[in-house]
Amino acid sequence: MEWKLERTAPRRVRTEEEMLWESIMRVLSKDLKQKRSQDSANVLDSVNATYSDFKSNFAKRLSAEVPVASSPITTRWQQSQTRALSSDSFGEEQSTTYLPEASGSVLKTPPEKETLTLGSRKEQLKTPSKGISETSNSALHFCKAPHAMDRDWKESVASKGQKCLKQLFVTQNVVQQANGKMQLCEQSECVWKGCKDGVRDESFHLKSSGDINDSILQPEVKIHITGLRNDYYLNILDWSFQNLVAIALGSAVYIWNGENHNGIENIDLSLTCNYISSVSWIKEGTCLAVGTSEGEVQLWDVVTKKRLRNMLGHLSVVGALSWNHFILSSGSRLGRVYHHDVRVAQHHVGTLRHKQAVCALKWSPDGRLLSSGCSDGLLTIWPHDPGASAQGQPLKVITQSTAVKAMDWCPWQSGVLAIGGGMKDGRLHILDINAGKSIQTPSTNSQICSLIWLPKTKEIATGQGTPKNDVTVWTCPTVSRSGGFFGHRGRVLHLSLSPDQTRVFSAAADGTASVWNCY
């Protein structure tokens, strides 16, 4: 039997479009073969190239491979694996952070500029051969070359970066860097824009607020500052028991003598961070803690002008610092609170967790309680337990309607805490933590950006935001207005009390700072 195969389907006829594409592909294939043959010939000719041509081409190739800078959070995350190898570091998980106090605040973690100066974040305690010392008594003169993800790029910039790796410590009366500037007001001869615009009419302000009987506080000295970040969530002003004022302007900390009103020196960290986000003096010495936008917590001795150590672990902006003897607590915008024992090499001794950004940290005067304020409106009271784990339970959690940033413990009455409400609240809250209730809640009709207690006169001073932009003094225990200072045109972001408790340093978003008598 014979089998015969027959075509059942009709013969397919190619269309003009298919024929056109086949023609195009043939041309492309031919061009590709010619290109490959030419490249092979060029490779053979390159054997005769000079060394200068090879060096020039190699340099051009390196310059084209510059890594793109990212935000501080991303940069720290990329280096988490490297920093885990350091004996002076620990990890922090990332979380989504929402900052509701949006009016006029710098709420985003990325810096003001589109680029970020990249610096090495890895620093080991036992690497003296690399020029870094991390002990409590040794000086740290150099930091590592700027870090980059590409190995070739790191090697190409290392030689240039070695000339500018020193942390700058400048000593002069008027300190000026690219980051900022502090200068005493020259009164009638002053050409500062804020002074040329004229002085605010305090009497009109008092009449409009109904407080004509209040006393008007006069400034002892007025200072012009540039580089102050208009960020509601930072804590960049502190006055030490040695009568030294520290204020962060950009990526530098300026040390100012509170007695003779002269600038002493500054600490410039522009090589390692975008800006400084918090400062805090230790109570028992001249050590200054500095938190940065890159998540570092550095300790500086302003007498010896040496950096004592650099404590890593945070992956985001460190916006709050608070001392309890030798325990330093730091809070970040990723909601982590770390306890550091600065006396030991393994400094990380405890962790507390929040769901949102930490805006404020304050240890009570007796050191038994820690209060933390968050951007989600939660005021949390923690027990004294530096070794707390991530599952540490708070003593109390009090819900507020706005972010809890302005906060301070009463120095003469145990368990009393004052917090300032944000723009949507506008109230000063005096809380009895032991009873878990509010004692007084007077309305300020404005955002409260900062506050401090005045023990000499048993009063509270609050730094107001929009629309008042002044400093209001409240008498306790009635919490009624008794006076104010009206020398600022921008919201008063920071307040700090002198060691003798008779003067207040105020810094505002309009680029002015004042020292005024409160006693």
From Swiss-Prot:
Region entry Disordered, spans: 79-133
GO MF annotation, one: anaphase-promoting complex binding
WD repeats: 229-266, 271-310, 311-341, 353-392, 399-441, 443-484, 487-519
Domain of life: Eukaryota
Record GO biological process: anaphase-promoting complex-dependent catabolic process; de novo centriole assembly; positive regulation of anaphase-promoting complex-dependent catabolic process
Gene3D superfamilies in the record: YVTN repeat-like/Quinoprotein amine dehydrogenase
Organism: Homo sapiens (Human)
First-listed, main subcellular location of the protein, grouped into a coarse class: cytoplasm
PANTHER family (alphabetical): CELL DIVISION CYCLE 20 CDC20 FIZZY -RELATED, CELL DIVISION CYCLE PROTEIN 20 HOMOLOG B
Compositionally biased region (Polar residues): 79-98
GO CC annotation: anaphase-promoting complex; cytoplasm; deuterosome
Function: Protein regulator of centriole-deuterosome disengagement and subsequently participates in the ciliogenesis in multiciliated cells (MCCs).
Homology family: Belongs to the WD repeat CDC20/Fizzy family.
Tissues expressing the protein: Expressed in multiciliated cells (MCCs).
Composition skew (Basic and acidic residues), residue ranges: 110-125
Keyword Zinc annotated: no
Pfam families, sorted: WD40_CDC20-Fz
Entries under PROSITE patterns matching the protein: WD_REPEATS_1, WD_REPEATS_2, WD_REPEATS_REGION
Name the UniProt record assigns to this protein: Cell division cycle protein 20 homolog B
Subcellular location: Cytoplasm
Record keywords: Cytoplasm, Repeat, WD repeat
